[in-house]
């Protein structure tokens, strides 16, 4: 007999505003527990020091997490000049202290130089794995292991403000996936000749998702209390916070098909649409309803890439 999943079936995406001081995985587990969800995953870890947007994918949405992992991100970062640390943030030990003798003009010039494509080595204090073990675990043992250089793209890095009394600068960064803001700050400190480390990092956007859609754990707890006071199911308020699955796929081309074609597609059969399909993943909509992603097969027909099990129940299997 198959083992029954604990929890209830929940499908959708929650834009959690992760608080400071907890790991992304702990935030995920707390949220999954509150929703009593059978299945959940996050898309793109934030350090315990960092706050901000952490998309939590429930149920069928977990099939499309890669699209959010691959998308660009936006951050607001504050950096302390004059101090370099082992981790490039305030969680690490200070390894050097220098006087800060920089002007706003110098800051603006050096910050602007980071815009564009470049190579970046991941920090040893990151969750990337080497031989199945996170890099930060090696770093804590004083072991440095080889890391592959990554191509990154800084779409924009703007100077926001400079607190000259405390030697703290604030910047806004719009970057490609896999970009380490701590590394950018550390490199900036070296260019300025004084060292620097991150003291605040807040992710304001993941792809097209805006900051206004974020929900905090405190807000979720307040809704739970409201549901209890009104003697209604928590899902009455919690599920209203979830975004549709296909909001993770806004950058994909869309193919619209009929309900009959959707029935064929949802049961794993390829469809000849008699059109020139684009390369790569395609968002498939049947009779106005999102039913999964597809791709072009060798014959030029539309085949299933990732289908939705929930949609199979809505269709009768074709003869």
Swiss-Prot record:
It comes from Pseudoalteromonas translucida (strain TAC 125). Belongs to the pseudouridine synthase TruB family. Type 1 subfamily. Keywords: Isomerase, tRNA processing. GO terms for molecular function: RNA binding; tRNA pseudouridine(55) synthase activity. Gene3D superfamilies: Pseudouridine synthase, PUA domain. It is an enzyme of class 5 (isomerase). Pfam families: TruB-C_2 (PF09157), TruB_C_2 (PF16198), TruB_N (PF01509). The gene is truB. This is tRNA pseudouridine synthase B. It catalyses: uridine(55) in tRNA = pseudouridine(55) in tRNA. Its EC number is 5.4.99.25. It comes from the Bacteria. The active site is at residue 47. One of its GO terms (biological process) is mRNA pseudouridine synthesis. InterPro entries: PsdUridine_synth_cat_dom_sf, PsdUridine_synth_N, PUA_sf, tRNA_psdUridine_synth_TruB, tRNA_sdUridine_synth_fam1_C, TruB_C. SUPFAM superfamilies: Pseudouridine synthase. HAMAP family: TruB_bact (MF_01080). Responsible for synthesis of pseudouridine from uracil-55 in the psi GC loop of transfer RNAs.
